[in-house]
Every structure is written in C-alpha cells, then in structure tokens.
Amino acid sequence: AEPLFRSSCLIADELAEECDFFSIGTNDLTQYTCALDRQNAKLEPFFNPHHPAVLRAIKMTIEAGHRHGIWVGICGELGADTALTETFLRMGVDELSMNAKSILPVRKIIRSVDLSKPSEK
C-alpha cells in the first residue's frame, strides 16, 4: 500500500494487517498534510516536507508497519533529501527510493551514521 493521506497514516495499524508492505508517498503526503495545492506557485513557500506533522505521519506509519512485520519504504522527493536521511534511518525505514544522481550523496550519509549513538541533531 502507498499511504498518501494523513488519514491512512492514522489507521496504519489496520492497513498493515492487510498489506505486504508500505511505500510512503511523501510528495502527496506533504501536499495533503499541509493542505496545499502543489500546482499553485503562490503556495509553494508553504509546501514544507520537513514540517513536524509530515515527519510524525511518516514515523507513525513506519512504526505501525514494523509492529505488523511489514517492510516500509520512502518514495517521492524526500527519499533523496540528505537533510532527512539520518532521521529516516533513526525512524527505522527499510528503503529510500530516489533518482540515480542522489544515490551517492545519500549512501555517503548512510555510511556515516552510527545508529548506536544519539543523534547530533
């Protein structure tokens, strides 16, 4: 399943009982969580994929998926967002989907993170 709406994140436990995996669609999740039209250039300054509500929805979904033993991935622009790579690793995400040009920068961060130590952020 691809949780795109805040409502699907809120019932992720129930959805996880019926699914083999979650692939969190971060572009739409951000749009719907922030109640914005991505096609409206005037609203672009308010489109914030780092908003605490978006990150909390992602974390809730990852935790629910893992409680039910299913794989959880991130797809959309946030998979390549190096500012969030460590955050997603600490949340327990199983996979980050991204375009080819983003693989090396993200891989560099993944290799540098020591999950046994507290976050420096």
Each model region followed by its residue ranges:
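Conserved alpha/beta-domain cores
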Residues: A1, F5-K121
